[in-house]
Amino acid sequence: MTQYSSLLRGLAAGSAFLFLFAPTAFAAEQTVEAPSVDARAWILMDYASGKVLAEGNADEKLDPASLTKIMTSYVVGQALKADKIKLTDMVTVGKDAWATGNPALRGSSVMFLKPGDQVSVADLNKGVIIQSGNDACIALADYVAGSQESFIGLMNGYAKKLGLTNTTFQTVHGLDAPGQFSTARDMALLGKALIHDVPEEYAIHKEKEFTFNKIRQPNRNRLLWSSNLNVDGMKTGTTAGAGYNLVASATQGDMRLISVVLGAKTDRIRFNESEKLLTWGFRFFETVTPIKPDATFVTQRVWFGDKSEVNLGAGEAGSVTIPRGQLKNLKASYTLTEPQLTAPLKKGQVVGTIDFQLNGKSIEQRPLIVMENVEEGGFFGRVWDFVMMKFHQWFGSWFS
């Protein structure tokens, strides 16, 4: 691996070591103590950088309850995105989605569907997200996948694809079931994916109420009414086995945080603890994007190609979360996986690592990727590059 770590070498190699912002007097990074959280498990994650700011028992497998509906919403959102279903499609409600006829649904949150009802996908989707309707989950699952079992297969397939390694779904709605579990960390990752992958689906999560069949029901996420935070989602979950769960997301300026609280003892506690986490995160941290998605971080020599240089960057991974007030002390260097870059190169190909440092300490690493395709050059050009590369290896940068 070829590493560019000093300022002088970096300038010779094409700005390999960069002051991302104007340097200031050294300010020692202060350790920010996380708040105590009254719950079985919890986590606070930055959306853009993926940085975990605080956590407690974040990998303990617990019952997600209606947080399961975040995945239900994700699957529906993906089906809409792929045009497999449309919001205007009319769904015929089956007997399995009838709370009166399905013992598993009695006493749970429902949309009050009846067998034979014709309900649009749009209304059922709002019934899942806003009203937490277990009957709506069943009706949508039957329509999207043909059965609840097939839909659960889709849920677990997406869980695997998203890297939710400690999550298994057994129901489409989240009512207690043997073998159904998730973790605070996995739920934060799922929430992040919902926002990023299906933003139109996520937008429904901020709606405060929904009326169906003349029955108005409020969104169960009371943080949507918070005067202290700009919360725009996501989902509550409550069962006897799970306790009181909440995934919440809020924004402040360009920064978005995701909090997860699992197994709180009361409804009030889950909201208070979530608000505490989000407020703490915004108070002590900030997220910056020193390398924009389409921006070039460094230009590097490439051999045997149809061009002599290639632009390298971070793609969508250029955001970092740092303690507030430390922005001007942020620097970055890069390391190439191989000593030389040789064509062909494909856009998005990983060729090294970007290392972000704060006050001389490495804090985050990101893939260094190719920003444009580089095809192989012609025969004579490749022969010439071979000769020049050998001279470069023998005599240094005079022949580059």
Curated annotation (Swiss-Prot):
The active site is at S66, K69, S132. It comes from the Bacteria. One of its GO terms (cellular component) is plasma membrane. Coiled coil: none annotated. This is D-alanyl-D-alanine carboxypeptidase DacC. It is an enzyme of class 3 (hydrolase). Removes C-terminal D-alanyl residues from sugar-peptide cell wall precursors. One of its GO terms (molecular function) is protein homodimerization activity. It catalyses: Preferential cleavage: (Ac)2-L-Lys-D-Ala-|-D-Ala. Also transpeptidation of peptidyl-alanyl moieties that are N-acyl substituents of D-alanine. Pathway: Cell wall biogenesis; peptidoglycan biosynthesis. One of its GO terms (biological process) is proteolysis. It is a peripheral membrane protein. The gene is dacC. Keywords: Carboxypeptidase, Cell inner membrane, Cell membrane, Cell shape, Cell wall biogenesis/degradation, Hydrolase, Membrane, Peptidoglycan synthesis, Protease, Signal. Residues 383-400 are annotated as: Required for inner membrane binding. It comes from Escherichia coli (strain K12). Gene3D superfamilies: D-Ala-D-Ala carboxypeptidase, C-terminal domain (2.60.410.10), DD-peptidase/beta-lactamase superfamily (3.40.710.10). Substrate binds at K235.
